[in-house]
């Protein structure tokens, strides 16, 4: 019987079968060969190459088992790290995704008999956090990458520095309040009883009709009054001058206190303006891929950030092809639009505010923007670095 042609249904079916997963009982782990049926597997077991592999394995079976176990563990953990990160996930979900690859290492060739035994072993070795629930075993990858540990240390250091700055500001405010209380004497009002020398005397009120009449009456009275009355008037005038001088000094003290408060507010605003973080990814911004590890297809191509994971990783969608990729922020850079386009501030005191690009300065690699959202709407900000802003999708 002749061999079937390339486009016959049988040939097409054979090629489809060869690409997909076959039954596990017809797979030879030593030779890493998958047979399609029982007859093919029987022929393979009788072949010379298979017999040679069995002889090699019989000389040192533990070495082969350790090799397969190590490969299985490394591939499983790599899939868990790349696909799920540090999220808590059911172990069966990870295993099903792992065995979907045609060239995977089968568990029956390793030192673990079941997936539960392998999960418990991961927990004992400290590679993952494992816990048992009524729905089964859940695992969580423990990231011990030096870069991740360095980021965590930097975040802890920054939090500690922020707490120190807050304590310094609180002490400064307390010192200002203490100085203000020491320089100001507290005035306690005193209440006295109304005393009348003659109970039969009537109480009268003199209401002047206007400034002219009062000034005229004063001038006429001053002409007829004696020197003692003039002394009394002079003393009352001096008392008024003293009161006015005291009120002016109090107003000056208030101005000084207000200036100190303004100084504190300026310090806080400057601190917020200069506050920076080592992460900048935000959803719905346009970024450019700068890594060459993905090939020329994605190098220097633009994409839209769809999701941010753990502050440093983003799921991006390519603008031209629509492909979705999961990349670290070190493999991305911001995109500066043309003047007049909308942007998003990614770092500094204006983080999270949308704005409009007004102009760019190519010599200093900075830009001038106008804030469009938030309480600072309408403010014009100069000297914003290129890496602190990006074009909105």
Curated annotation (Swiss-Prot):
One of its GO terms (biological process) is DNA damage response. It is found in: Nucleus; Cytoplasm. A zinc finger (C2H2-type) spans 28-50. Residues 51-160 are annotated as: Winged helix-turn-helix (wHTH). It comes from the Eukaryota. Ubiquitously expressed in all tissues examined, with highest levels in skeletal muscle, heart and testis. Differentially expressed in non-tumorigenic and tumorigenic cell lines. Highly expressed in proliferating epithelial keratinocyte cells in vitro (at protein level). Residues 209-224 have a biased composition (Low complexity). The modification N6-methyllysine is found at residue 135. Its main location: nucleus. Gene3D superfamilies: 2.30.30.140, 2.30.30.30, DNA/RNA-binding protein Kin17, conserved domain (1.10.10.2030). The modification N6,N6,N6-trimethyllysine is found at residue 135. Residues 284-334 are annotated as: C-terminal subdomain A. The keyword Zinc-finger applies. Residues 209-260 are annotated as: Disordered. GO terms for molecular function: DNA binding; double-stranded DNA binding; RNA binding; zinc ion binding. Associated with DNA polymerase alpha, RFC1 and cyclin A, in multiprotein DNA replication complexes. Also associates with replication origins at the G1/S phase boundary and throughout the S phase in vivo. (Microbial infection) Interacts with SV40 large T antigen. This is DNA/RNA-binding protein KIN17. The lineage of its organism: Eukaryota, Metazoa, Chordata, Craniata, Vertebrata. The gene is KIN.
